[in-house]
Amino acid sequence: MRMITGIKHILLGVFLLLGASCAREEQIPEPNIYLGKTLPLSIRLGSRAPGDDPDGSVTTMRAIVFNDKGQLVCNEVTPATLDGNVYTAQAKAVRGTNHFYIICNETEELAGKLAQVTRQPDIEQITFSAVGLTAPVPMYGKVTDAWVSSDSDGSNAQVTVNNVTTGVLPVSVNRMAARFSFTAIKNITGGED
């Protein structure tokens, strides 16, 4: 009888150890964060050519990136540099599907609101005041369902968008506001109004 009880305790102990190891195995997420170099972005202006006027320039770029599960990967501001007729900047991404939201030339008000973004639906709810806007104006673009792949150490990143694979993520941005000035002239004639 003591022998049967001893065997039961041993079997129970083995099952508990196996159960604990399986539970721990399921809790460890697969690290798929792209920790190597950041992904280069090629930013094209959708409505203007660079250099036309101050409104057609990009000075800073904020990349807000989410993975396919809607988890925030990156929400950072980096400087943008002009290379020929394309602005370039950097953004972090994960291996797999990414959704990129690019905001250029953010105002102080817009920067405060964008810094608080942690969920993908939050981006569409953000508004800002364009009163007193000075050049360069804020611009916005997005690339959804971009597939990022890289070596296991994060090097040699490639991005595929619309079945085209390249080492640079192409982004087209358009102005979020317009600045204009006008002069009103009333034609005064001696007749009736």
Where are these regions (language model features)?
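C-terminal motif of bacterial Sec signal peptides marking the signal peptidase cleavage site
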Residues: 18-21
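Bacterial signal peptide processing site
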Residues: 23-26
